[in-house]
Amino acid sequence: MTRILLTTTALACAATTAFAGGVERSAGSVAILFEEGNWAEFSLGYVDPDISGVQAVPAGPSSPAGAQSGDIAPAYTQLSGGVKWVISEDVEAAIIVDQPIGASVDYATDTGYLYGGGSAAFGGSVAEVRSLGITGLLKYNLPNNVSVYGGLKAVKTSGEVSLFNGYAMSTSTETDFGYLVGAAWEKPEIAARVALTYASEITHDFASTENGSPTAFSTTIPQSLTLEGQTGVAADTLVFGSVRWVDWSEFDITPPGFAFATGGSSLVDYDNDTITYTLGVGRRFSEEWSGAVLASYEAAQGGFSGNLGPTDGSTSLGVAVTRAIDNYEITLGARYVWIGDAETETPSALPYPPGTTLGDFDDNSGLAVGLKVGYQF
């Protein structure tokens, strides 16, 4: 099984994090470590979610039940790249650059929906989280087709939010460190590989400004465990898949001023961890062309979702195709996502008992497309 087919499946798998749980935008794949020889790659993705909801209860004269939120999830681009070197027969190294977490939420101001400013004079609600990650890895090849690998990851993160009720918060830009460790077994003659990777949590201690007042809080990017596998099942045909667990129940954004004003609520938090399953088939059509199809599933957790992230689980289908030209490989991929239905809860300031539904976000979807260019040198 040649590199062209493996590159096709790699881009197909990478696209699955575009709508993953929490605020994850990149799974931090270490697949580059298993490329043949010296290798460089660059990926560009465009993600266009379509997430909208309907208000279930009135929140004032200008914010009635039935108000439509409009699409609250702006499209965004995603960049990543990496370089891998063969240092010796037993040692290989790689540097990976990605955007591991991110979020973009924008409730329009002219909809009547509460978070769009339907019952207040402060306008809509906007939130943004940005990050940049750099990972350095070493892989040591042991006898019997076994390898171990590990390294350090630095993540730089910042964010800001402004809500319909006049609350505004921005953070400092913080850079902190975590680590990755893993092990793999390979059988190259049938393109078989199983790899297990653990990524540690990374905690940021932010300085923040809430409505002009200096505050501080901590947020933890959660730990994760990823099992990836692939094997040839027939001439020029590869089956691949993964199972990824992320400890999202440990993630929260809880600035102290917001918590005090709302009786201890968080801006963003998650009650449950997520497990994402991916399964696909790759096929080499010729020495120059290969393709792949894949499906991905993340179960809904139930309960309420946050008003700044009203989704719950997802199901997706994706395709990718690769063209090899000399030492270059160019891959195009696309994925359509059925985003899980979600309900959000009324804020504590409204005269409703806890557990009252504010918004129903149903029948939402998204489209992700990507381009990857790889070069063997």
Where are the regions that the model predicts?
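N-terminal, post-signal peptide beta-strand-biased segments of exported outer-membrane/organellar beta-barrel
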Residues: T2-A108
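Outer-membrane beta-barrel porins/channels
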Residues: G21-V23, S52-Q55, A59-P61, Q78-S80, ...
